[in-house]
């Protein structure tokens, strides 16, 4: 009974308290606040739905625009395909007609015995044919006047021999070989020296003599003036070296007997204005071997950093793969450093030789790129090499250089100190310092010699004992640091540069030095760098000199790749197919003779001009990118 009363009393008290709360009116305020919160959430949800609808409309418009662009791209690809096929059919038909005209000329003009008597009508018809040939050749010259150096703009922009240009069936163009491209380029240069004069025709009436390295060919040239003047005939016998199918490698035509010659005209010497290009004043550095290319996938110009748009003409180096605008050609960084054949060891843990190619000068591409960019933008920057750049950016750039095949554009890096730190980091993290463990003691001892002449001689001896990669890289770096020290804006004299690069490029005398030895070596390292920077510039420049003639011969020989020997045939072989038309024509032989005479003159800086050499190196093309 008592328990029941207690429970009832407790329940009664709870009811009383709740009644008091209701009477006070607090519950209504809380309910109103909840309703307001729900209203705020409802408004936010409404705004979110409106924004969602807006973005859905924008997405729909973007999808529509993308679909329209896809259709345009598809039509453009189809149109390119159609135009390529149409041009190839026209070229095949043109080649067939040229072959027929060639045979007619051979019959009418190669008769030296005079058995064929030409009437006035026949002379008029023959002069008409000659005018047609001259006009067509001149038109071709105008068409290719801007690409005489490489002759690649009229090559198939969608296809090449690598079958990697576009994503359609490459079997459509496999029947049109590279020889036709070479023929078109050869024809485009027939009148490069000026307007055509009286047309001459040369035909072979002799046979090839099977000897060791040459063949003897007899030829007759008949000149028929278009104004009905007297007909001139010239007969010559020439000895020709076996043709290597490379106009850049074919030797000059040497006449061995000209007793039957009725008339002869010496070749006019070419003036400086006839040069196809002017080489840079490089002091013997390795030059770039440029070829022209029509851009399909947009690329960036290395000298100026701007994008090269679709369909524009660009230049690409065969060796280092550098890309530039034609007008930026003279601003490309030198020397030309070919890319590595394989992938080096872990980043920053390799020897210097792991990061260089086998071509001289043996300098890592990262060093060349950094130095060229620093000299372009950093010679007016105070504290160059003393101020550190962002470590994260330096690490990212280093990975791009050593992992990616293409060289990143350092012109897009705003902070020049990042590039300086990149160069120092690369040299610092090599397995073996630039001056090597083996020779570090010799360099230190040479720097401590009090007599300047003896110290310089000992330094020369130590430099000569370095591996070629270390020696070339050291020379390139010293040339650069001397330029930095000569710039007053950088405020980095030889002493300051020695403080930066002493511990970087000079090794310690022992593998694991203690603190005392490290402190002693630092002073000696500074003396070594100061002594190296005091050596004359001419001494370092000699390591940058390369024999451009040997480089060109290596390029032409495909880096000494073994191949099947060429068959000894006459350059004026039988006229049977359009491909053999490019073997020997009167105008092409005249041009090759003139190019040979031009190359025999004394070149600038002791090396042959690359502009004349490049004309004979058009049989190979680099892989074009995919068009997706």
UniProtKB/Swiss-Prot annotation:
Positions of modified residues (N-acetylmethionine): 1
Matches recorded under PROSITE patterns: RHOGAP (PS50238), ZF_DAG_PE_1 (PS00479), ZF_DAG_PE_2 (PS50081)
Membrane topology, record value: Peripheral membrane protein
Cross-link type Glycyl lysine isopeptide (Lys-Gly) (interchain with G-Cter in SUMO2), residue numbers: 249, 405
ZnF locations on chain (Phorbol-ester/DAG-type): 287-336
UniProt modified residues of type Phosphothreonine: 162, 343, 564, 577, 585, 602
GO MF, one annotated term: zinc ion binding
Sites bearing Phosphoserine, chain numbering: 150, 155, 158, 165, 171, 204, 207, 215, 258, 388, 411
Coiled-coil blocks: 33-110
Subcellular location: Nucleus; Cytoplasm; Cytoplasm, Cytoskeleton, Spindle; Cytoplasmic vesicle, Secretory vesicle, Acrosome
Tissues expressed in: Highly expressed in testis, thymus and spleen and weakly expressed in brain, heart, skeletal muscle and kidney. In testis, expression is restricted to germ cells with the highest levels of expression found in spermatocytes. Not detected in adult liver. Also expressed in fetal liver and in several hematopoietic cell lines.
Domain of life of the native organism: Eukaryota
Xref: Pfam families: C1_1, RhoGAP
Region (Interaction with SLC26A8): 107-286
Keywords attached to this entry: Acetylation, Cell cycle, Cell division, Cell membrane, Coiled coil, Cytoplasm, Cytoplasmic vesicle, Cytoskeleton, Developmental protein, Differentiation, GTPase activation, Ion transport, Isopeptide bond, Lipid-binding, Membrane, Metal-binding, Nucleus, Phosphoprotein, Spermatogenesis, Transport, Ubl conjugation, Zinc, Zinc-finger
Domain Rho-GAP, residue spans: 350-540
GO BP, sorted A to Z: actomyosin contractile ring assembly; erythrocyte differentiation; mitotic cytokinesis; mitotic spindle midzone assembly; monoatomic ion transport; neuroblast proliferation; positive regulation of cytokinesis; regulation of attachment of spindle microtubules to kinetochore
Protein modification: Phosphorylated at multiple sites in the midbody during cytokinesis. Phosphorylation by AURKB on Ser-388 at the midbody is, at least in part, responsible for exerting its latent GAP activity towards RhoA. Phosphorylation on multiple serine residues by PLK1 enhances its association with ECT2 and is critical for cleavage furrow formation. Phosphorylation on Ser-165 plays a major role in mediating interaction with ECT2. Phosphorylation on Ser-158 does not appear to contribute to binding to ECT2.
Annotated site location: Arginine finger: 386
Function: Component of the centralspindlin complex that serves as a microtubule-dependent and Rho-mediated signaling required for the myosin contractile ring formation during the cell cycle cytokinesis. Required for proper attachment of the midbody to the cell membrane during cytokinesis. Sequentially binds to ECT2 and RAB11FIP3 which regulates cleavage furrow ingression and abscission during cytokinesis. Plays key roles in controlling cell growth and differentiation of hematopoietic cells through mechanisms other than regulating Rac GTPase activity. Has a critical role in erythropoiesis.
UniProt comment concerning the protein's domains: The coiled coil region is indispensible for localization to the midbody during cytokinesis.
PANTHER family: RAC GTPASE-ACTIVATING PROTEIN 1 (PTHR46199:SF3)
Protein name: Rac GTPase-activating protein 1
């Amino acid at each position: 009974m008592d328990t029941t009363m207690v429970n009832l009393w407790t329940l009664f008290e709870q009811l009383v308290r709740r009644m008091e709360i209701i009477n006070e009116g607090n519950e209504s305020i809380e309910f109103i606040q909840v309703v307001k919160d729900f209203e705020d959430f409802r408004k936010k949800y409404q705004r979110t739905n409106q924004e969602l609808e807006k973005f859905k409309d924008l997405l729909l418009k973007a999808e529509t625009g993308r679909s329209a662009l896809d259709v345009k791209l598809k039509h453009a690809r189809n149109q390119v395909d159609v135009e390529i096929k149409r041009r190839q059919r026209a070229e095949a038909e043109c080649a067939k007609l040229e072959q027929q005209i060639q045979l007619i000329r051979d019959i009418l003009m190669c008769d030296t015995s005079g058995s064929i008597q030409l009437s006035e009508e026949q002379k008029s018809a023959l002069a008409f044919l000659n005018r047609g040939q001259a006009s067509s050749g001149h038109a071709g010259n105008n068409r290719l006047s801007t690409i005489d150096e490489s002759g690649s703009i009229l090559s198939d922009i969608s296809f090449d021999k690598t079958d990697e240009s576009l994503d359609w069936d490459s079997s459509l163009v496999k029947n049109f070989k590279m020889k036709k491209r070479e023929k078109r380029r050869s024809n485009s240069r027939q009148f490069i020296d000026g307007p055509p004069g009286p047309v001459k025709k040369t035909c072979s009436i002799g046979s090839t003599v099977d000897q060791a390295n040459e063949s003897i060919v007899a030829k007759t040239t008949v000149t028929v003036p278009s104004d009905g003047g007297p007909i001139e005939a010239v007969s010559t016998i020439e000895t020709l070296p076996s043709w290597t199918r490379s106009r850049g490698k074919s030797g000059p035509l040497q006449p061995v007997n000209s007793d039957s010659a009725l008339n002869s005209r010496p070749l006019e010497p070419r003036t400086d204005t006839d040069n196809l290009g002017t080489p840079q004043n490089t002091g013997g550095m390795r030059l770039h071997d440029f070829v022209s290319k029509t851009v399909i996938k947009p690329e960036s110009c290395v000298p100026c950093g701007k994008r090269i748009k679709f369909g524009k003409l660009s230049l690409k180096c065969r060796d280092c793969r550098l890309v530039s605008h034609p007008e930026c050609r003279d601003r490309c960084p030198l020397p030309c450093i070919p890319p590595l054949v394989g992938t080096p060891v872990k980043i920053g843990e390799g020897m210097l030789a792991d990061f260089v190619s086998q071509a001289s000068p043996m300098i890592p591409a990262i060093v060349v790129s950094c130095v060229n960019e620093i000299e372009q933008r950093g010679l007016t920057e105070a504290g160059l090499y003393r101020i550190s750049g962002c470590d994260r950016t330096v690490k990212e750039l280093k990975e791009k250089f050593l992992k990616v095949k293409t060289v990143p554009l350092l012109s897009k890096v705003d902070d020049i100190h990042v590039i300086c730190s990149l160069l120092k980091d690369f040299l610092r993290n090599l397995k073996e310092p630039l001056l090597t463990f083996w020779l570090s003691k010799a360099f230190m001892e040479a720097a401590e010699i009090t007599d300047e002449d003896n110290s310089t001689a000992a330094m020369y001896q130590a430099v000569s004992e370095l591996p070629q990669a270390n020696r070339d890289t050291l020379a390139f770096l010293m040339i650069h640091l001397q330029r930095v020290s000569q710039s007053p804006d950088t405020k980095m004299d030889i002493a300051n540069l020695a403080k930066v690069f002493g511990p970087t490029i000079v090794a310690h005398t022992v593998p694991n030095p203690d603190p005392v030895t490290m402190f002693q070596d630092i002073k000696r390292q500074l003396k070594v760098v100061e002594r190296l920077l005091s050596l004359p510039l001419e001494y370092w420049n000699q390591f940058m000199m390369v024999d451009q003639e040997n480089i060109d011969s290596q390029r032409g020989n495909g880096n000494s790749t073994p191949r099947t020997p060429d068959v000894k045939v006459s350059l004026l072989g039988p006229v049977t197919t359009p491909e053999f038309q490019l073997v020997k024509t009167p105008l092409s032989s005249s041009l090759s003779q003139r190019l040979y005479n031009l190359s025999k003159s004394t070149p600038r800086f002791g090396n042959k001009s690359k502009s004349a050499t490049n004309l004979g190196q058009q049989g190979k093309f680099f892989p074009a990118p995919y068009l997706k």
